[in-house]
């Protein structure tokens, strides 16, 4: 009897081990395949963006040169990869001198047409009209399209890739409550905390202030505008209704008091002080992923738009 029970237990363990091995193999295979596809899209976007930048530079140099002023470089164009300041205009507060050094400014063209699609996103949007933008954090794997669907299925891309195939990784996505084009006062983007370091896994590095000091900027483009955000708070909270901070439910503040309370809560929960406090009228971005030190935890990186 004991021997028979032992055999049964061994068989159960073998089956459980085999099932786990199959799951992990499928998990990492799917992740690797999806990451390769995302890398191809990122490379395509980068190439088209670079070609656009070069064409704009060429057009600028081919036009009639303006009269040179004392101390000015007559070949210099007015091209500004950062666009215009945010509502509060705190460039001195939001940017450090090092971040404003030319070698630290990425070649990211700005086309704020308000209606025309940025040309480097046109092809991808034609492939999947659910694409609403592009998210990038430099020196990380975060370089992905951002998706959005209707209210009847707001989490559609939680476990679907860009091509709408089932995927453990899913896509980076915004729920329908957020309007990225208006934009809403706060836009929350969701992504998985993948074991292979892809999707939003990198966000966990912001638990350490040194990561924020070295890499505080987030680049989030809509289909029509390019924008830069700077992280002002990093925190964790419970995702259970009625327990944690419901940051994801705030899209448009009813008034200045509600906006300020939202910012204050983000900063109260923050692991460290960044010295940045957004003001009413600024536009915010929250990146949300799973956090495993608390039950149903969420790890959130909150940023304010600076261009």
Language-model features: where?
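Solvent-exposed, non-transmembrane regions of membrane-associated and secreted proteins
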Residues: 20-307
